[in-house]
Swiss-Prot record:
Region of interaction between pPR and pAP is called Amino conserved domain (ACD). The region of interaction with major capsid protein is called carboxyl conserved domain (CCD). This is Capsid scaffolding protein. One of its GO terms (molecular function) is identical protein binding. GO terms for cellular component: host cell cytoplasm; host cell nucleus. It is an enzyme of class 3 (hydrolase). Its EC number is 3.4.21.97. Gene3D superfamilies: Herpesvirus/Caudovirus protease domain (3.20.16.10). A motif (Nuclear localization signal) lies at residues 439-445. The active site is at residues 82, 151, 173.
């Protein structure tokens, strides 16, 4: 339940008391005579239902504390939306009942009645009655439409016990409002107080009699004239604020049920408005519109009465919960639904109109018939293979011409053949040109039957199926390469040759593989020239190929040469002799692979020789082919072949 606007809330918190008009005094005879022409409007309703829960603690009233300040010493003001300048009448009294605190008031402001008459002439909801058993009364209908509830302005409930006997009034005024903070505070307007009390079933007969007897004694003519000086702009602003109260009509129905108000009344809690009749508004104002405006707004006299007679019974027979069957749909959503329904209906109508196929003729047209068989004898090229009639009187075979049926009769007609498929007007056998690969030996991965559809701008791409085939081929090649890496082929070991000066040496010298320190030579060590050689074609060395132990010819021992002096050049066919130039140290190779004998000889002492100046050596290390480079090459070739 949403809280009402601040304009319609009751001022229950303790604050500085508002100036209260002076008690009623003697009324001049002229003023009383002017008000005698218009009957006063009475109203009654609960300003608080004790048993109904409230939204705030300040809204609760203790019946014992309230009863101590009743009855009122005199009438209190009755205004609109708690506005002091909108004083429209007087509150005759507050009566404490078993169900709640009941209020009885009267409206006597002549300026306010004039404003109600002008508003009712322009309001469609005010002129729509929920029950036609009641006589039309524009003033009562407008009051129920605009100000359907009551709001009591009093001091805070906590200050009620100690406020008795003070100078501050306990109840300041009662306001007519669009929505009160307390539930069940709906007002019933009428011209008779007894008729108003009869609409509240929550009041017992004894309570109705006590209220009518106690508050009917002061005559409305004896009360002073209210000073209604509020501008229309302020009242309009309050009405606009009330229009933004959430679920206002639903709350108004709840208040009507809480107060137990029975029909018929002028209450507009369940009434839907009709379009306003501008002619009645103009007649009430006493003005005339231009002729063009009158033509645009005046309905046709033949249809005006009929339309109003059809609309009023509909509004009268509408149930109280009729608005619950309606839902609010945005305009865009409604237009979308409407367009969808129209499209569906259009397709359905077209299907019913052209959906049933038309019966084709018994004989197909000549254009779709099978051509006659060719003659058994050859025909000159370029002519139709029609049968040859050597007899002059022989009649050729003529086929009657049958026109083509309409398009709807043959939905599955074969499409026309292209020109290059025809030979002499007769379909020729299919021909597909031989595909010429971009390079010799290219593997064919595309099928001739595959056909790519039309491509639009931005869709120039290869078919997904062909790309998947290329990826599968690449995966198979990668798998083959991985398998080949698991079982690599033996590579020849590098044979080392020293980069020596061209000096004659007496004895030949072999230079096998250097130790591990060769790749990171220390200061003073001799570098080497590394080159991969074929051990069977190299000169000046012993063939040294890896192989299983004990198989083949005996291998020569692996030697390590330490250069401390003159270096000897290798000789073709030389053996492992000439220890005078360098000390040769024989050792057993690690890992089970050896070149030479399996026995290890003890080291021999090295004779000291005169050191030669260190020579600069160059290393040329040829790398193995990279597998990554090979994969990149294959991938690039595949991309080039696909483009």
């Amino acid at each position: 339940m949403s809280s009402p606007s601040p304009s319609s809330s009751s001022s229950d918190h303790p604050s500085s008391p508002a100036p209260v008009p002076a008690p009623p005094g003697p009324v001049p005879e002229a003023a009383a005579a002017s008000r005698a022409s218009r009957a006063p409007v009475y109203l009654g309703g609960f300003v608080d239902v004790f048993s109904y829960p409230k939204d705030s603690r300040a809204l609760y009233l203790n019946p014992a504390d309230v009863g101590a300040h009743l009855p009122l010493p005199g009438p209190i003001p009755l205004n609109v939306e708690h506005l002091q300048e909108a004083h429209v009448g007087w509150t005759l009294g507050l009566h404490l009942t078993r169900y709640g605190l009941f209020c009885v008031a009267v409206i006597t402001a002549e300026e306010f009645f004039t404003l109600l008459d002008r508003l009712c002439a322009a309001s469609s909801v005010a002129r729509t009655r929920a029950d036609h058993h009641l006589p039309p009364n524009p003033t009562l209908e407008m009051l129920h439409t605009w100000l359907p509830e009551l709001s009591l302005s009093s001091i805070h409930p906590d200050a009620l016990p100690g406020a008795k006997g003070g100078d501050t009034p306990i109840f300041q005024h009662v306001a007519l409002c669009a929505m009160g903070q307390r539930r069940g505070t709906v007002a019933v307007y009428g011209e008779s107080l007894d008729w108003i009390l009869s609409k509240f079933t929550s009041l017992s007969p004894e309570e109705r009699g006590a209220i009518a007897e106690g508050y009917a004694s002061p005559a409305p003519e004896s009360l002073p004239e209210p000073h209604f000086t509020c501008s229309n702009e302020i009242l309009m602003a309050k009405a606009i604020d009330a229009g933004f109260i959430k679920n206002r009509l639903e709350i108004l129905k709840t208040d009507k049920g809480v107060a137990e108000v029975k029909a018929p009344t002028y209450l507009k809690a369940s009434v839907q408005g009709l379009p306003a009749n501008l002619d009645e508004v103009d007649s009430a104002r006493g003005g005339e519109d231009p002729p063009t405006a009158a033509i645009a707004t005046t309905p046709h006299p033949a249809t005006d009465a009929t339309t109003m007679n059809q609309q009023q019974p509909f509004a009268a027979q509408a149930p109280a919960g009729g608005c619950e069957d309606l839902i609010s749909v945005p305009r865009s959503t409604f237009m979308t639904m409407l367009q969808t329904n129209l499209d569906t209906m259009r397709q359905t109508s077209l299907g019913q109109r052209f959906g049933q196929p038309i019966d084709a003729p018994a004989a197909p047209p000549a254009q779709l018939r099978v051509p006659p068989p060719a003659a058994p004898f050859p025909v000159h090229p370029g002519y139709y293979p029609a049968p040859y009639h050597p007899q002059v009187d022989a009649q050729a075979q003529y086929l009657p011409y049958v026109p083509l049926p309409p398009p709807g009769a043959m939905p599955f007609a074969p499409p026309p053949l292209p020109d290059f498929y025809k030979y002499g007007g007769i379909p020729a056998p299919g021909y597909s040109p031989v595909a010429h690969p971009a390079r010799p030996g290219k593997r064919k991965r595309d099928c001739d039957e595959e056909f790519e559809g039309p491509l639009f701008p931005g869709e120039i791409h290869k078919d997904v199926q062909s790309l998947s085939k290329s990826i599968a081929a690449l995966q198979s090649e990668l798998k083959d390469i991985k398998n080949s890496q698991q079982f690599p082929q033996p590579l020849p070991q590098p044979q080392l040759q020293p980069q020596a000066q061209p000096q004659p040496q007496p004895a030949p010298q072999l230079y096998p593989a250097p130790p591990q320190a060769f790749y990171h030579p220390a200061a003073g060590d001799q570098g080497y020239y590394v080159r991969y050689l074929n051990p069977f074609q190299a000169s000046g060395g012993v063939p040294c190929a890896p192989g299983p132990q004990g198989v083949g010819e005996p291998q020569a021992p692996q030697v390590t040469v330490t250069h401390n002096g003159h270096q000897a050049a290798p000789q073709a066919g030389g053996g492992a002799t000439g220890a005078t130039a360098a000390n040769v140290e024989q050792r057993q190779p690690e890992g089970g692979e050896a070149c030479g004998a399996q026995q290890q000889q003890p080291p021999q002492p090295q004779p000291q020789q005169q050191q030669q100046p260190q020579q600069q050596a160059f290393v040329e290390a040829s790398t193995k082919p990279s597998q990554i480079s090979q994969l990149q090459k294959i991938f690039c070739e595949e991309l080039l072949n696909k483009t």
